[in-house]
Amino acid sequence: MIRCSAFLLSFAFTLGLGGAATAAAADPTEAVRAVAEGWYQAAVRQDREALNKYLADDLSYCHAGGKVQTKAEYIASVMAGPPHYESMTYDGMHISIYGKTAVLTSFADIKLVNTPQFRVRTLHVYVENGGQWQLVAHESTRVGK
């Protein structure tokens, strides 16, 4: 079954059908990883369409400083003005699947424009909606290097 799913996923990407919705049909751990990476890239690129796809409508986004934003507020802040993120690099990613819910933990090194790089510990909750995994909750805490 795993070989078949990997083959189908590979075939779908070859046809240009890749993305979060397609990945959800394969291994859920890899589907969540793909959505997480897509979200990071969308935030850095200020890609509103991709952010809308990867973030759940009822998103609760809690920044390391304690500020909490809705999906609309988070996207508006990412899109406002020049790019905010220079890079986001994640390591130590661990994903646990619980039916249609996934919990992702990791460390992230974040570089904002005109700000020294800092490290956070992240906790993400993803839900599968209509065959597509989406980020529904984000929490981060600053940690030392």
Task: Indicate residue ranges for each PLM-predicted region.
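N-terminal secretory signal peptides that target proteins for export/translocation
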Residues: 1-2
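Bacterial N-terminal signal peptides
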Residues: 6-19
